[in-house]
Amino acid sequence: MIYTIRISKKYFYKLVNMCKEYKSYRECVMKELEKKYQVKIYNSTRSHDMNIKNDLIPKVINIIFYDQENERLEELAQRLGKTKYEIIISLFK
């Protein structure tokens, strides 16, 4: 099962600053979740991560969590008693 989260324009610059050392926003969000919660989420076998462009015009970014990543995120959400959305957006607050 796939889970997609829409990161609004409101958080675009926070996302850009957080992701300077990563090659894609998807990788960045998952690695930052791993750092914050000490849980393995990112599955690097997916070859179609969207590379970060040098475009600083605020835009909506969609982050896709595929099968195993989504399952791990669901387990984390159940353990913390939060929704998947709350866990991801907490990175930007």
UniProtKB/Swiss-Prot annotation:
Top-level division of the source organism's lineage: Viruses
The protein's name in its UniProt record: Uncharacterized protein 25
